[in-house]
């Protein structure tokens, strides 16, 4: 039976152009706090941001800031073109930070989560630092402003997308999700994967949490693929299990399923929250996800503090398929850190 990796598209390119833009001097630090070496971007705003500010941007909702990883996510051509046309952090900040009131200041790299939240919401959601004539209010009469500005230097595509957001913002705000942290999943390797082509398969992994999807690269013609690839998911307050699926990439037809599994992330998050700041502790075991008849674990999955980070090694037997095992590592990144 064939399944398609719906909504993901084939693993693509575009990252090189984004990385080239990232090398500009103004883009080598976070647009919001100045932290060095940002690895995230707001595709609709046009700025590069650090991991800590990325968490705040995600909590605002994608209708305000659509966050993508420079290295981990697939970028559409339109998203890449928009980032390049805006020109980077200096250009965007010349609009969004045009009128910072006297006595107010940007947060620094070591600022608290609350300081970042206040500044970033003021900057993008409420547009408090824009020239008043550039602010756009909702056509529904809502007092909440869209994170948009009108500038001849910006592409018509971006402005049009802001106008669309303005007309439909209220129902989106009602469904806005607040996130509590980020889940970094390292897809390590697969073993004895199912054959879906003549003699082999071209496997890739898809992770789904709520409405989010993250996808690995394709490993060509390999039943024992090695990825060692990091994927990132935002975790909301009311989170469920992560759905893992493996597909066989096919150029001319729908990608075939190569197995799936449900990953319970509650033990990891509960253990991490119980201990608080992991940097306060030495290396130690703090939890365990137990193997049982109703999960896909090959063996008990241990949760450890290692080098100041909360990590969990997971080995799963893929379900609803004739063969295949997958090894991965999960790491919990709370937004408050």
Swiss-Prot record:
Xref: PANTHER family: ADP-RIBOSYLATION FACTOR GTPASE-ACTIVATING PROTEIN AGD12 (PTHR46220:SF1)
Cellular compartments annotated: Golgi apparatus; Cell membrane
InterPro entries with a match to the protein in the record: ARF_GAP_AGD11/12/13, ARFGAP/RecO, ArfGAP_dom, ArfGAP_dom_sf, C2_dom, C2_domain_sf
Tissue distribution: Expressed in roots, leaves, flowers and siliques. Low levels of expression in seeds and stems.
Protein name: ADP-ribosylation factor GTPase-activating protein AGD12
Function summary: GTPase-activating protein (GAP) for ADP ribosylation factor (ARF). Binds phosphatidylinositol 3-monophosohate (PI-3-P) and anionic phospholipids.
Zinc finger (C4-type): 30-53
UniProt remark on domains: The C2 domain binds anionic phospholipids promiscuously in the presence of calcium while the N-terminal region (1-174) show a specific affinity for phosphatidylinositol 3-monophosohate.
Source lineage: Eukaryota, Viridiplantae, Streptophyta, Embryophyta, Tracheophyta
A cellular-component GO term for this protein: Golgi apparatus
UniProt superkingdom: Eukaryota
Molecular-function annotations in GO: GTPase activator activity; phospholipid binding; zinc ion binding
Gene Ontology terms: biological process: intracellular protein transport
Predominant subcellular localization, coarse grouping: Golgi
């Amino acid at each position: 039976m064939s399944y398609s990796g719906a909504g993901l598209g084939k693993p693509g390119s575009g990252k090189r152009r984004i990385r080239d833009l990232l090398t500009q001097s103004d883009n080598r630090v976070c647009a919001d706090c100045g932290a060095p070496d940002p690895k995230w971007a707001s595709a609709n705003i046009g700025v590069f941001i650090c991991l800590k500010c990325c968490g705040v941007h995600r909590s605002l909702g994608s209708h305000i800031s659509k966050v993508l990883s420079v290295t981990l996510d697939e970028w559409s051509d339109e998203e890449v073109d928009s980032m390049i046309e805006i020109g980077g952090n200096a250009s965007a900040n010349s609009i969004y930070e045009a009128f910072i009131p006297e006595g107010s200041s940007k947060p620094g790299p070591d600022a608290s989560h609350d300081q970042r939240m206040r500044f970033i919401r003021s900057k993008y959601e409420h547009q408090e630092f824009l020239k008043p004539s550039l602010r756009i209010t909702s056509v529904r009469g809502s007092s909440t402003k869209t994170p948009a500005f009108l500038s001849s230097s910006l592409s018509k595509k971006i402005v049009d997308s802001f106008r669309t957001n303005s007309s439909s913002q209220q129902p989106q705000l009602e469904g806005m999700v607040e996130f509590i942290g980020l889940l970094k999943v390292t897809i390590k390797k697969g073993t004895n994967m199912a054959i879906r082509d003549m003699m082999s398969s071209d496997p890739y992994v898809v992770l789904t949490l709520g409405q989010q999807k993250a996808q690995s690269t394709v490993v060509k013609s390999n039943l024992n693929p090695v990825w060692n690839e990091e994927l990132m998911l935002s975790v909301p307050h009311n989170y469920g299990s992560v759905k893992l699926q493996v597909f066989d990439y096919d150029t001319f037809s729908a990608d075939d399923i190569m197995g799936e599994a449900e990953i319970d992330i509650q033990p990891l998050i509960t253990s991490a929250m119980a201990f608080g700041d992991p940097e306060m502790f030495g290396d130690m075991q703090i939890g365990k996800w137990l193997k049982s008849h109703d999960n896909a674990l090959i063996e008990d999955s241990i949760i450890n503090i290692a080098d100041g980070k909360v990590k969990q090694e997971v080995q799963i037997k893929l379900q609803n398929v004739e063969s295949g095992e997958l090894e991965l590592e999960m790491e919990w990144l709370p937004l408050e850190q």
